[in-house]
Amino acid sequence: MENYNVKTRAFPTIGIILLGGISDKKNRIPLHTTAGIAYTGINNDVYTETKLYVSKDEKCYIDGKEIDLNSDRSPSKVIDKFKHEILMRVNLDDENNLSIDSRNFNILSGSSDSGAAALGECIESIFEYNINIFTFENDLQRISESVGRSLYGGLTVNYANGRESLTEPLLEPEAFNNFTIIGAHFNIDRKPSNEIHENIIKHENYRERIKSAERKAKKLEELSRNANIKGIFELAESDTVEYHKMLHDVGVDIINDRMENLIERVKEMKNNFWNSYIVTGGPNVFVITEKKDVDKAMEGLNDLCDDIRLLKVAGKPQVISKNF
C-alpha cells in the first residue's frame, strides 16, 4: 500500500511583520496582519521533506520520531479531512489510512510552516490543485498559523483579524537575488510559540500593535511595488524592535545577552555598510546584507554566535515524486 505516495519539499520562514496573538489553539487564525519570507540555504540545503502515503495504520513521524495523532497541531487533523477523497482516487476504502513521514534539514527557524506547507503540497498535488486554496490555508493553519509564507514562497503578506485569514504573494525570490541572509544561531532553548501568543495580547498597547501591523503591511505593499528591498528589510528591523519590546514588557524575553551583543555589533557595522536584522521567536539573529558585503559581515559576527549559515529567499513547495 505504501506504493501509493507523494513526496514534497517546502521551505521554512522568517517573519517580516512578526506574528503575536492567535484566535485559539485549535484554529490558530492570526489576530492581526503579518508578513514573511520563505528561505533556504545558498546551496538550497535548508528545507522540510514530507512523504504522504497509504498505510494500514495511521502514523505520523517527524524527524524519525512518532508523534501523538491527537496532540495539538497534529497533521492528522488535516489529513483526516481529506482522507476519504484521497483513498477514493486509488479505489481504496476507509479501512485504509494515510500516514506521513516528515524530516527537517538544516532549519534554524520556521519548520512548522514548512512542515505544514509540505503536507499541503502533498494533498494539493493529489487533487491536481483543484482545491480551494483559501479555505485550505485555514485548514493548514491548524498546524502552523503562518503556513502561508511557505505555501507561496518569496515575500508574502497575510491579512488576518482573528476570524479570517488570507495570504497574498508580494515578491518572487528573484527580487532578492542581490541580498544574503546571515543566520546567526545560539545554542539555547526557544520559547514555545504559544507562550508568545498568550502573553503579548496582555500588553496594554496590543490594540495599537494591531493598527501598527496594518500600517506596516500597506507600507510593505508600496515597497514591494517599487522593489525596494532595503526598505523591506529596514521595515522588518523596526518591527523586530517593536515586537520584542512588547514581549519584554509582558515578561517574555527572546533576546538574551549574547544575542544582544551580536545585535550591537550589527548596529556598529551600519557605519561601514548597509545591513538590517530580524529576530523572530527562536534563538537566532538573521542579518541581511548586500551580497558584496557578506564577507565583511561574517568577519564581524563569526565570534559572537554558536553557528552561522548563509541563506537566501526561497520559492514555493515542490513535488519530488508522486504515485497517486
UniProtKB/Swiss-Prot annotation:
Binding residue positions for ATP: S109, G110, S111, S112, R190, S193
Pathway: Isoprenoid biosynthesis; isopentenyl diphosphate biosynthesis via mevalonate pathway
Record carries keyword ATP-binding: yes
Enzyme Commission code: 2.7.1.185
GO molecular function: ATP binding; kinase activity
Keywords from the named record: ATP-binding, Isoprene biosynthesis, Kinase, Nucleotide-binding, Transferase
Binding site for substrate: L19, E145, R149
Entry superkingdom: Archaea
Subunit structure: Homodimer.
Name the UniProt record assigns to this protein: Mevalonate-3-kinase
